[in-house]
UniProtKB/Swiss-Prot annotation:
The gene is TAP75. One of its GO terms (cellular component) is telomerase holoenzyme complex. Keywords: Chromosome, Telomere. Disruption phenotype: Telomere shortening without affecting the accumulation of TER or TERT. Component of the telomerase holoenzyme complex, composed of the catalytic core (the catalytic subunit TERT, the telomerase RNA template component TER and TAP65/p65), which is associated with two heterotrimeric subcomplexes: (i) the replication protein A (RPA)-related subcomplex, composed of TEB1, RPA2/TEB2 and RPA3/TEB3 and (ii) the CST-like subcomplex, composed of TAP75/p75, TAP45/p45 and TAP19/p19. TEB1 and the CST-like subcomplex are tethered to the catalytic core by TAP50/p50. Its main location: nucleus. This is Telomerase-associated protein of 75 kDa. It comes from the Eukaryota.
């Protein structure tokens, strides 16, 4: 098709806006898969000719019919144009069956929608009858034998990596256009927008990018679940919502994270925020899921497009083990801030967020923490009530030198370190059960971190009383090292009369199965080996610049408990029992060792050796 120089400027401008809005989120992923001469550079001018991932539907005419001479089946034609730079390619879409057609009619009601299609087939349109708007077309079985026209989806929204096959899309379309001597094609979708019609396995992305002018904001939920038995719960929930509501009310976006589709799946239920009935229905069907972690909000696709998301923790302790999906957000009454996310993948987003969140009025933060007091109590394991926020600050720090990190840089300016973490400095006024107001410094952390504190009821009371007398400073750091995402917890105080100066915990491994362990103990009584182990740990600490976080046996001198932090792994010993177990189902606490006598010394080298063996086994399984 000839290039149209007089392309409608408004449409071009719309596409450019959409592209600019999504550019920051996808440029790194696209660059990794494009040929070297087409890689994006951070300061590149936007070249519209590089847009290979948007289908632009300029016009839809559902009154135009297709007819199959063999079956006499009639299908509506959805006319559209694919915009590639300044080149405009016309095409048509037909549905494979009436159910899909109804979904498409609802989907194409709104103008200027950009939609990414998957696993589509190109048809040659034959013998177009201009009088009665009827077009004959071949069956897909006949066509496949004569034309190589299988195409794959262009982009996976979650990983932002273009599939290799998609790079040939334009050349394929152009080649077909030249060979057919026609500007029109039919794209047949193999599944509908309805989630139940999506093909198995769940390795496709269904993603819709909306113009801000069309929809001011959307609401929805995100269901996060690992592939396995719990996916059935998600499917049942989706089916319930669909069976009991108008199907055109909800848009379904199902995302398989990254290239390892067995790792993690996100299911988005998106609906118009003005549709109160849809909101109520969704809330009704979410009631059975009692373990809702946090209510979330994400401004991701456009400035005016909001997806309100809920993360679900199931009783089995499902937790994503991919650092790229640790994007937890907290939202309440318009107050939004990140609880945890991958800085390296979201540098620009991080920069904007830190600027905006640090400008939030303290009254809003105070209201947030006050209303979410239950959450804080359950996480912190003591009974306090936030009364007022006196100070709030979120910033990036270097994990090595602890100095503030310049957003956008890959290395720390001060020490050239490569790991950064987000810190939340929130000074609050808390109120205990006796209504004694005391000042406390609390660095927020989520329920995962709380699991590191194996606090009994009696200890909880002791900690509770302690808070009424002294200031307690608790700080949680998250780093984003790919192999060892360490969580460093620092206590600058004595909690329930125990010195906890520094300790280090982490969850770098995939879930460990119980059967890997057995009840036979490897009891190390050699004093020389014990000394060698402690020396190894000390050297490890110095080599890894962890002077502030001494890596050694950290003992809790309470009753019969001892907790050890070795090589970034949380290990608990309990002398009241006699078998060694792996703590499940909480994935972040990887290994629990239980021994019969308190005077037994466990070798750190042995622990590290077992952990490394487990890592090898896990890598082999993956």
């Amino acid at each position: 098709m000839e290039i149209e120089e007089d392309l409608n400027l408004k449409i071009l401008e719309d596409v450019k806006k959409l592209y600019l809005q999504s550019f920051d989120y996808i440029k790194n992923g696209i660059s990794s898969s494009l040929p070297s001469d087409k890689k994006f550079l951070a300061d590149d001018d936007i070249d519209l000719s590089r847009i290979t991932f948007l289908y632009k539907f300029i016009s839809v005419n559902p009154t135009l019919l297709l007819i199959n001479e063999k079956t006499q089946a009639k299908r509506r034609i959805f006319q559209g144009e694919y915009l590639y730079g300044k080149k405009k390619i016309q095409f048509n879409i037909i549905a494979k069956n009436l159910e899909i057609e109804r979904e498409l009619i609802q989907f194409f009601k709104k103008p200027y929608q950009c939609y990414i299609m998957h696993n589509v087939q190109v048809f040659q349109m034959l013998n177009k009858n201009k009088n009665n708007n009827v077009v004959e077309f071949m069956d897909s079985e006949d066509l496949q034998s004569s034309v190589d026209c299988q195409l794959y989806y262009l982009i996976d929204e979650s990983s932002h990596v273009l599939e290799d096959d998609s790079m040939d899309f334009i050349s394929t379309l152009t080649r077909l256009s030249d060979s057919f001597n026609s500007n029109e094609f039919v794209f047949e979708t193999n599944y509908s927008i309805q989630i139940s019609q999506m093909p198995k396995p769940l390795n496709t992305t269904h993603f819709k990018l909306l113009q801000p002018k069309v929809v001011n904001s959307f609401e929805g939920v995100i269901l996060q679940v690992q592939e396995g038995k719990n996916i059935l719960q998600i499917e049942e929930l989706i089916d319930q919502v669909y069976l009991n509501s108008r199907r055109d009310r909800f848009y379904i976006l199902k995302v398989a994270n990254g290239k390892n589709y067995m790792d993690f799946i996100e299911v988005y239920l998106v609906y118009d925020n003005e549709d109160q009935e849809a909101k109520q229905q969704l809330q009704f069907y979410l009631k059975p899921f009692q373990r809702i972690l946090i209510f979330q909000s994400l401004k991701h696709f456009t400035k005016n497009l909001k997806l309100f998301m809920i993360s679900f923790f199931y009783s089995s302790g499902v937790q994503p083990n991919n650092s790229n999906v640790k994007n937890f957000l907290v939202s309440h009454k318009g107050v939004e801030f990140f609880s945890r996310f991958d800085i390296q993948k979201n540098e620009l987003l991080c920069k904007d967020l830190i600027k905006s969140y640090n400008k939030l009025p303290l009254s809003n933060i105070s209201k947030l923490l006050e209303d979410e007091g239950v959450m804080i109590r359950s996480n912190m394991k003591f009974q306090v009530r936030v009364k007022k926020v006196k100070y709030f600050k979120i910033r990036l720090n270097c994990l090595n030198c602890k100095q503030e990190w310049t957003v956008g840089l890959k290395n720390c300016i001060n020490c050239k370190g490569q790991q950064s973490y987000i810190s939340y400095n929130i000074q609050v006024l808390v109120q205990d059960q006796h209504f004694l107001e005391q000042q406390a410094y609390i660095y927020l952390y989520d329920d995962l971190a709380a699991q590191f504190f194996n606090i009994t009821e009696s200890e909880k009371k002791e900690l509770h009383l302690h808070l009424t007398k002294n200031e307690t400073f608790i700080q949680l750091y998250y780093s984003f090292n790919k192999d060892y995402p360490l969580s460093i917890i620092k206590f600058k105080d004595k909690i329930f009369n125990k010195d906890i100066t520094n300790c280090i915990v982490a969850y770098p491994f995939a879930d460990i199965d119980n059967k890997i362990f057995n009840s036979q103990q490897q009891i190390i009584q050699d004093e020389n080996l014990r000394i060698e182990s402690e020396k190894f740990i000390q050297n490890f600490t110095e080599d890894n610049n962890l002077q502030e976080s001494k890596l050694y046996y950290e003992k809790f001198k309470s009753k019969n408990k001892q907790q050890i932090f070795v090589n970034g792994t949380y290990i608990s010993t309990n002398y009241s029992q006699g078998q060694k177990i792996c703590l499940k189902p909480i994935p972040c606490l990887k290994v629990m060792y239980v021994f019969p006598q308190e005077d037994i010394k466990l070798s750190a080298l042995k622990i590290i050796e077992e952990i490394n063996q487990l890592k090898i086994q896990i890598d082999q399984l993956n």
